[in-house]
């Protein structure tokens, strides 16, 4: 949520910044409604002041034994008028809140401006792309011999785009998750296994709705709906909603391992088959609450952890600074970490690290007391650390051998009982 006071003070500048994300944005409706709200507040305060004066006159008249009937009627009329104004004010405030809730976060000043991902900038590349002495296989082709995934079984029970892991695929998935969780813990993150269902207001707080309402799975729970989380960012942010932290508590680092549920997975087409784009996947999520001065430090910390893991997994990767047209609704800055997938002949995102400034905390009401005792909104950051489906694809496709086997990254072997190679099921 954006600060209406800043919009009111510098409307042209705010609109210019927002149009870098969406050229169609106009702040005129917001400013017009804000003007109405302020006028109604003034009218309300004026009537309240008049009512107080009349109440004093009534008290004085009664003390002096003077008939106060007319004064009492005036107060009753004022009270009725005030009630109407207050109701109108509540309606206009709700409308203003709704308009503000659809405005994205401002992009940072150093973000490349573009309408889509074509404007993203590769800022770092690490590792050489693999050179094979044989025709490399797509991970679904490798799976025919490895027998670690079963999309057909999942399609029977749930539908297309839902994965089912089996045999050593289960062990490899949990090895990745355990490795990543231990990495977060070693870097001082507090670990969580949170609920997978959240209230609608928690999705609002993290910025997923109202703009993207309808894109999430939900279940009916009495008179309300609970939503399956699209990322643990939602619930980690929600844990501190409406809280007032102390400055000494910050920065506060959280990490969670959860399944994530996304409805849009099936829209990419046949090219992104298998695990490249699915409705359900595991992800370790990093989240931080900071002061404004700690924001950049936390960002670098998250980014370094992601790079550390990709380096230890010995996967070729690159970092891309996202343009305004490819950034999320809540982010002011995002760097994607992308791994090379030989089966796709392209780099694919396995982590997005984002700074969200005070955008989410204003929606969630998360504040802290600064050293002067003044209440301030915290800054929030989030980053995947990491998402497993494409990571597993990268491991399978980059480490495949001519006989269809796959070399296990050394860093994962302790979590697999020392297993060094995934052999085809018949070997």
Curated annotation (Swiss-Prot):
One of its GO terms (biological process) is selenocysteine biosynthetic process. Its EC number is 6.1.1.11. It is found in: Cytoplasm. L-serine binds at residues 231-233, 285, 384. ATP binds at residues 262-264, 278, 349-352. One of its GO terms (molecular function) is serine-tRNA ligase activity. It catalyses: tRNA(Ser) + L-serine + ATP = L-seryl-tRNA(Ser) + AMP + diphosphate + H(+); tRNA(Sec) + L-serine + ATP = L-seryl-tRNA(Sec) + AMP + diphosphate + H(+). SUPFAM superfamilies: Class II aaRS and biotin synthetases, tRNA-binding arm. GO terms for cellular component: cytoplasm. Keywords: Aminoacyl-tRNA synthetase, ATP-binding, Cytoplasm, Ligase, Nucleotide-binding, Protein biosynthesis. Pathway: Aminoacyl-tRNA biosynthesis; selenocysteinyl-tRNA(Sec) biosynthesis; L-seryl-tRNA(Sec) from L-serine and tRNA(Sec): step 1/1. Gene3D superfamilies: Bira Bifunctional Protein, Domain 2 (3.30.930.10), Serine-tRNA synthetase, tRNA binding domain (1.10.287.40). Homodimer. The tRNA molecule binds across the dimer. Belongs to the class-II aminoacyl-tRNA synthetase family. Type-1 seryl-tRNA synthetase subfamily. Consists of two distinct domains, a catalytic core and a N-terminal extension that is involved in tRNA binding. PANTHER family: SERINE--TRNA LIGASE, SERYL-TRNA SYNTHETASE. NCBIfam families: serS (TIGR00414). Catalyzes the attachment of serine to tRNA(Ser). Is also able to aminoacylate tRNA(Sec) with serine, to form the misacylated tRNA L-seryl-tRNA(Sec), which will be further converted into selenocysteinyl-tRNA(Sec). This is Serine--tRNA ligase.
């Amino acid at each position: 949520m954006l600060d209406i006071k800043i919009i009111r003070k510098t409307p042209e500048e705010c609109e210019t910044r927002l149009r870098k994300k969406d050229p169609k944005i106009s702040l005129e409706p917001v400013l017009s409604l804000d003007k109405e709200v302020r006028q109604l507040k003034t009218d309300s305060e004026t009537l309240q002041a008049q009512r107080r004066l009349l109440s004093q006159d009534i008290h004085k008249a009664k003390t002096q034994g003077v008939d106060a009937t007319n004064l009492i009627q005036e107060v009753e009329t004022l009270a009725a008028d005030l009630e109407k104004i207050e109701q109108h004010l509540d309606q206009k405030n709700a409308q203003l809140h709704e308009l503000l809730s659809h405005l994205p976060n401002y992009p940072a000043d150093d973000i490349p401006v573009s309408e889509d991902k074509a404007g993203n900038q590769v800022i770092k590349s690490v590792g050489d792309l693999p050179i094979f002495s044989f025709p490399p296989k797509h991970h679904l082709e490798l799976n025919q011999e490895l027998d670690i995934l079963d999309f057909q079984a999942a399609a029977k029970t749930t539908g297309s785009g839902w994965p089912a892991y089996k045999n050593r695929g289960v062990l490899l998935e949990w090895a990745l998750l355990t490795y990543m969780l231990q990495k977060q813990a070693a870097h001082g993150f507090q670990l969580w296994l949170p609920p997978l269902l959240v209230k609608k207001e928690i999705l609002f707080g993290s910025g997923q709705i109202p703009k993207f309402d309808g894109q999430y799975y939900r279940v009916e729970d009495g008179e309300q709906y609970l939503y399956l989380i699209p990322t643990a960012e939602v619930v980690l942010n929600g844990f501190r909603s409406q809280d007032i932290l102390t400055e000494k508590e910050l920065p506060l680092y959280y990490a969670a391992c959860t399944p994530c549920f996304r409805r849009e997975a099936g829209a990419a087409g046949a090219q992104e088959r298998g695990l490249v784009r699915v409705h359900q996947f595991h992800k370790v999520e990093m989240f931080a609450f900071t002061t404004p001065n700690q924001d950049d430090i936390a960002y670098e910390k998250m980014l370094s952890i992601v790079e550390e893991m990709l380096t230890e997994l010995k996967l070729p990767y690159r970092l891309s600074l996202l343009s305004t047209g490819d950034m999320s609704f809540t982010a002011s800055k995002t760097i994607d970490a992308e791994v090379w997938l030989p089966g796709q002949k392209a780099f694919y995102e396995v982590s997005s690290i984002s700074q969200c400034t005070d955008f989410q905390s204003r929606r969630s009401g998360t504040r802290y007391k600064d050293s002067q005792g003044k209440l301030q909104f915290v800054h929030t950051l989030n980053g995947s650390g990491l998402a497993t489906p494409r990571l597993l694809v990268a491991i399978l496709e980059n480490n495949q051998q001519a006989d269809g086997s796959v070399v296990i990254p050394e860093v994962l072997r302790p979590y697999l009982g020392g297993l060094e190679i995934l052999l085809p099921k018949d070997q």
